[in-house]
Regions:
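Conserved residues in the N-terminal Rossmann fold of short-chain dehydrogenase/reductase
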Residues: 64-65, 107, 261
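N-terminal hydrophobic signal-anchor/signal peptide
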Residues: 1-14, 39, 76
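Conserved beta-strand scaffold in the Rossmann-like NAD(H)/NADP(H)-binding core
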Residues: 63, 130, 168-170
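Strand-loop microenvironment adjacent to phosphate/nucleotide-handling motifs in alpha/beta enzyme folds
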Residues: 5-9, 122, 154-329
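Conserved Rossmann-fold NAD(P)-dependent oxidoreductase catalytic core, especially the SDR/UDP-sugar
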Residues: 82, 88, 92-151, 156, ...
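Conserved Rossmann-fold cofactor-binding substructure of NAD(P)-dependent oxidoreductases
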Residues: 65-85, 267
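Helix N-cap at the beta1-alpha1 junction of Rossmann-like dinucleotide-binding domains, i.e.
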Residues: 44-49, 234
């Protein structure tokens, strides 16, 4: 990753990374340190990951244990540090869990994004970057739908903000991140059976360095309101990934290690998309980074209030039905 274009935007700046103890957030923190950020504030509710990054990176990193769902606490933190740049990576991301607890996807992912974005604007941050996912495109999962709501909220903020530039980045599946398929396959190989949902299921893949490159470099070309996507090439069959991981471990697929097909889970797609049909990807000065204009829906604020009402009543079925309608209209 060539960081020379990014350094002037980061050097001597106060940067905040929500979810900074996670696999993506921690790599953002490491890169910010190399780019000579003045201070890096990790906001994370999970202390172990944040502690590890703090020990590795050193005094430049400050850790605040807090939930992005706690407005008063986040307000205190924002007021204390006055970040120039906010990278919002904190989120619930596991599709099956969010199908079981859709109200938590709304409270954490959507309301959490709203709170952090509002506070970034309140304290005059220069940039706010949302970490989103390709599962937000034509979502069939609650998790994907919640991230689509986040994209729309950030776009709505960009239309009204006088100072802060609001943008988003869409990730594919990030290799070797927490909960991703390759570490799972490696563990399953030890037991002699690897599970794949469907023989034809495909996903777009990117590495952790590519994910961080997208986050940092897109910020240098953001005007506000855009969504940036890394050109990951074609989608890859998960079955091919499983077979390769088995072979790389010195074993023979279907002989030394069985592969079982478990069926798509609720919320799983057979194939993901990087863009909605109405979005028109445009090239940027960075060869591998594409840009689309953000978008929203009519009466978004009113719809969001109705969604929150259902979420805070813990109406799981109501949340699921409403958020799917809201993000596929």
């Amino acid at each position: 990753m060539d960081l020379k274009d990014v350094q002037p935007y980061i050097e001597d700046k106060v940067c905040m990374v929500t979810g900074g103890g996670g696999s993506i957030g921690s790599e953002i923190v490491r890169s910010l340190s190399k780019l000579n950020a003045e201070k890096i504030v990790i906001v994370d509710i999970y202390e172990n990951g944040a502690y590890s990054v703090k020990c590795e990176v050193g005094d430049k990193v400050t850790v605040e244990i807090a939930s992005v769902r706690d407005y008063e606490k986040m307000d205190c933190i924002m007021n204390k540090y006055r970040p120039d740049i906010v990278f919002h990576a904190a989120a619930h991301k596991h599709v099956p869990f969010m199908e079981l607890s859709p109200e938590e996807a709304v409270k954490n992912n959507v309301k959490g994004t709203e709170m952090v974005a509002d506070l970034a604007e309140k304290y005059n941050a220069d940039n706010f970057v949302l970490i989103s996912t390709d599962k937000a495109v034509e979502p069939i999962s609650v998790m994907g739908a919640s991230k689509r709501c986040c994209e729309m909220y950030v776009y709505e903020k960009s239309l009204k903000s006088k100072h802060t530039k609001f943008s988003a980045v869409r990730f594919g599946n990030v290799l070797n991140s927490n909960g991703s398929v390759i570490p799972l396959f490696k563990k399953q190989i030890e037991n002699g059976v690897v599970t794949v949902t469907d023989k034809d299921v495909t996903r777009f893949f990117m590495t952790i360095p590519q994910a961080v490159e997208l986050v940092l470099m897109s910020m240098t070309i953001a005007n506000g309101g855009e969504i940036f996507v890394f050109d990951m090439g074609g989608a890859v069959r998960i079955l091919d990934v499983a077979e390769k991981v088995i072979k790389d471990g010195g074993k023979v697929p279907y002989k030394d290690v069985k592969i079982e097909f478990t069926g798509l889970r609720k919320g799983d797609k057979l194939h993901e998309k990087l863009f909605f049909d109405f979005e028109q990807p445009q090239k940027t000065r960075y060869k591998k980074i594409l840009r689309v204009n953000g978008s929203s829906i009519e009466n978004f604020a009113e719809m969001l209030d109705k969604l929150y009402e259902k979420a805070y009543k813990n109406d799981s079925d109501g949340v699921r039905e409403f958020i799917m309608k809201m993000t596929n209209s």
